Amino acid sequence: MKLSDWINRKRHNGGYGIQSPSSFFFITQVLKERLPYYSYPILDQAVGGNRAKKRHFRELFRITNYQQPANCISVGSATAACTMILAKPSVAHYAVTPTGLTAGRQSLLNEKGCHIVDSTEQLRTIIDKVGTIGMLYINTIDGADTLIRAALPHTNKESVIVVDGINRSKTAKLWWQQLVDDSATVITYDFYNYGLLLFDKDRIKQHYTLKR
């Protein structure tokens, strides 16, 4: 990471330098929340892996719990699908081409009523079915840019899109920057490993970069 990037992330770390009350609350009380959730043990078991991976998906859990989306769609990650369905089990869930679909994760998704589809071509059908996206998680898989472009017209002020792997490659960085600059997105967050896109047109367009 370049020194200038590190300084920028350091300046914003912990919510400092953020003037928007809603963004400050989101960062300090949601993203950096330290109190345990009752679902964490089940979540950690479903996620597996090291501490960093568990922290990453605990953040996704808290974001989902905070946003209270009307529906949840994950593309390219069974772990993300499990995370969102544990955080908000009462709405429709769709898992598109979920990589890492172990027997345990599939059992959890089936138990909670998640609709699992094996082709990204079906994402458009799912979006048409739900009408407006509640929460969409998408990994930087091949064709992800096209999928998100198809999703953007189906967002509103309550929608959130989580883009994983935004700094994974030069191509991913360029693609992420294009999304940040897009007129459809309003509030965007760069958490280094992943980014968030929000669409509330009542707010001023703003981008935040935080140290991970």
Task: Please annotate each region the language model reported.
Residues V162-D164:
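Short beta-strand/loop segment that forms part of the nucleotide-sugar
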